[in-house]
Swiss-Prot record:
Keywords on record: ATP-binding, Cell inner membrane, Cell membrane, Cytoplasm, Membrane, Nucleotide-binding, Protein transport, Translocase, Translocation, Transport
Pfam families hit by this protein: P-loop_SecA, SecA_DEAD, SecA_PP_bind, SecA_SW
Membrane topology designation: Peripheral membrane protein
Quaternary structure, from the entry: Monomer and homodimer. Part of the essential Sec protein translocation apparatus which comprises SecA, SecYEG and auxiliary proteins SecDF. Other proteins may also be involved.
Full protein name: Protein translocase subunit SecA
Domain of life: Bacteria
InterPro entries in the cross-refs: Helicase_ATP-bd, Helicase_C-like, P-loop_NTPase, SecA, SecA_CS, SecA_DEAD, SecA_motor_DEAD, SecA_preprotein_X-link_dom
Function as written in the Swiss-Prot or TrEMBL entry: Part of the Sec protein translocase complex. Interacts with the SecYEG preprotein conducting channel. Has a central role in coupling the hydrolysis of ATP to the transfer of proteins into and across the cell membrane, serving as an ATP-driven molecular motor driving the stepwise translocation of polypeptide chains across the membrane.
Reaction(s) catalysed (UniProt annotation): ATP + H2O + cellular proteinSide 1 = ADP + phosphate + cellular proteinSide 2
EC annotation from Swiss-Prot or TrEMBL: 7.4.2.8
PROSITE patterns, alphabetized: SECA, SECA_MOTOR_DEAD
Chain residues that bind ATP: Q96, G114, E115, G116, K117, T118, D554
GO MF: ATP binding; protein-exporting ATPase activity
Amino acid sequence: MIGYVLKKILGTKNDREIKKIRKWVEKINALEESLDKLSNKDIVLKAQDLYFRVNQNEHIKQAIIEGEMVEELIEAFALVREASKRTMGLRQFDVQLIGGIVLYQGKIAEMKTGEGKTLVAAAPAFFTALTDTGVHVVTVNDYLAKRDATWIGPIYRFLGLDVGVINSDNMSYIIDWQDPEKAMEAIEKDIRVWPKGMVGDAIDYSKIDVHAKTSYFTKAISVERAKAYEAHITYGTNNEFGFDYLRDNLAVSKDQIVQVKGHGYAIVDEIDSILIDEARTPLIIAGPSNLDNKVVLQANEFVQTLEIEKDFIVDEKNRTAMLTEEGIEKAEKYFNIQNLYDIRHIDLVHAINKALLAHNLYKKDVHYMVKDGEILIVDEFTGRALPGRRWSEGLHQAIEAKEGVEIQEENQTLATTAFQNYFKLYKKLAGMTGTAETEALEFKEIYSLDVVVIPTNKPNIRKDLPDAIFKTKKEKWEYIAKVIEENHAKGRPILVGTVSIEDSETLSKLLEQRGIKHNVLNAKQHEKEAWIIAQAGRKGAVTIATNMAGRGTDILLGGNPEFLAREILKQKGIDEDKATEEEWKQAYEEATKITQKEKEEVIKAGGLLVIGTERHESRRVDNQLRGRAGRQGDPGESRFILSLEDDLLRIFGGDRVKKLMEFMKIPEGEPIESSIVSKSLEGAQERVELQNFQSRKRLLEYDEVINIQRSVVYDIRRSILFQDDIKEEIKDFIKDVIHTQVFTLLTEDEPELWELEPLKTFFKEWIDLDLPEKFEAKDREELEEEIFKLVMEKYAQKEQEIGEKTMREIEKVFTLNIIDNLWREQLHTIDKLREGIYLRSYAQRDPLVEFKKEAFRLFEELMLNFKISAIQSIMNAQISKEELEQQEQNMFNLEIDTLNKSMAISEALENIAKEFQEKRPRFRTLKDRLEERKKKLEKKGESA
């Protein structure tokens, strides 16, 4: 009661947070009028001045990196809003500025669909980018990364910042003006999209100069990967940022490093999708392993002879499948072996387990699709295909065998990290989503991120109708088709969310039978995605979409006038880039009339109707689908139409609902609409969410062990990679190896009790070093020093033998190669350890504790083996006479080339010097000296 009263008086924690931020927004608004009076050039100069001020004050710079509230934020955010108005004709609402400040502080901004999240990221990204640290804006797919960077690009370019984009397949871009001359002229002539003098919320869209936008259009220009990362702000997907990090830590030269600015600040769009939904799937870079594909094919044939429940059991809740005792006996008979679980048959057991999963838990057009003889993973949260991604540990091969396509080699992990640990690399992490509050605890516990719910710009008036549940899928689909037909006849736009490609195609056929025109948006059609979504709010539009989460495009009632204007120009045969101001104006006016008229008709019909055809495991994904209706205060409706055969109901409590329907004598074809059923469904979702949270938490606990090791290994790699001379590190390695061997092999303190033979054997086998029969040392520390001198003498001999420069190169190449090979083996061993560690629980031991102990022991061995192997390889390096001669020849050629270039430069200088006769003798002398030096070298080369 007291808490309730206090909340009423003081407001919630979220209310208090918003109240504090509003004071900063008022200060930003106070600058709008004065900035509006400035010319474009003055705004550009103000941005440059702010950049220099930030970089000249280390205290302010550090405060910005950490997300502290500083006075410079007011000017930065005001400049971004002004640039947005002038180049794009968009003015950030106060709630968008609030969202931007929340992101700047390193928190999660929960903003409803249609509140303009893409634009919200611009101000915090710009302000933090002034510090010249790596600012990454993370999206869920390549299309959105490139689209968002190009769309927001005019703001950044206008204010003097570079923007990069990274896509998959190693495609990278820099965003620049589509027509640099036109853009510079527009800045010079003070051309604005948003008219001068129009300040504040009162917006007269008829005064927006649409044609002026064309002056500020941007385009993506292909560049090398590192160039995209050198930009002040880089857009890309979570997968590509993560993979580039792993690839950087497999690089064998500094030139191969692409994430040149490191990890300063990340703004993650759809943060719940990336950090929660995808957290169970680690990022893996893999190479070929030794598993024989014949075993995969044999396992695939074998599992098709088995009977479910009798020979194997499937646990859909935990997504596992395993052989029963009868199944094991069948396997031993089928493969003619005595003991299936003998160590010799480990690959066969592995292949059978994966084949069971492939046939019983992974469904075509739900979890994967077959395209051009290849298995493509379908992201269950977005419905998109993920080309280039493969399931690890033999699962992908098992599905290839199941579908009868070519089986590609199984991959061995070369580098891996979990998204949780990758994003923890950033000094400041923030994110946006329409639905984060339900996962606030997980964000706080795992990422130390607070969630702030941002108020909507206009009140939400969407109606969420109760669920309708049918006995069978057939009844459900018939009813959905009927609801669509009725609402389509009224001219109402309808969006239907399905969970699989198969479902979207089932509904599509039903609508075709009824003669209803519609668009299908799924993993097979995402190239047309933007166009389909842009039209989804038009009168009578019917859109079927697999999982709307993360689509990233607003559905405007009546349609998007800008998209329609482009269509109109296209229909008239006019290239939009070459269209005149008058042509653009006419097309836009025509499009605006059409969309405005349709919007009024759609609003009368009740706004957008959203139909969910199946409940998702996560309530968030359901809420994201609902959120497509009712944007920016528009009317709208949402409803889930389900069946007892849907996965969630079938696995979690469908029997109870079925009994209830039978008890209530619900006739066939009639739905049940009951609060008891809705609560039962929500309870099932909560249980799955909790189960998935525990799974992600457990994954993180295990990956944290590997993460500590990974950090050490990657730090060593970078230290080696970024130094030209690692001789001092090599000396330290030698000292460490000597210390370990002396203290391991000589257990007694007194020299007379030392048994030196094992020590002598080790050094002989290690680097072919013969230790003396006796040492003068009085203790083990002195003995270490004596042995170190002997090893360094041998080391000096090797350096003299192959040359100092070659020795330095060999040290780097060998150490990098060895640590990579050992780390690869470590990951393989850790994978196997993790697979079997659960067995320790049968001995009343905590598997995680046991895993930590074993992993630590393995890592200690790795570090010692690394040092031993590195020194051994360097000391045993053999450079042939031919290689040495080739090196000398290369050096000779290099020097001749350098001299030729020097002579060319001297000739250029001589030409310039003709105008300055008094300097001519000096250049002549230089040229003569260079020619003389070249002749001597050539003579030396001939005699050699």
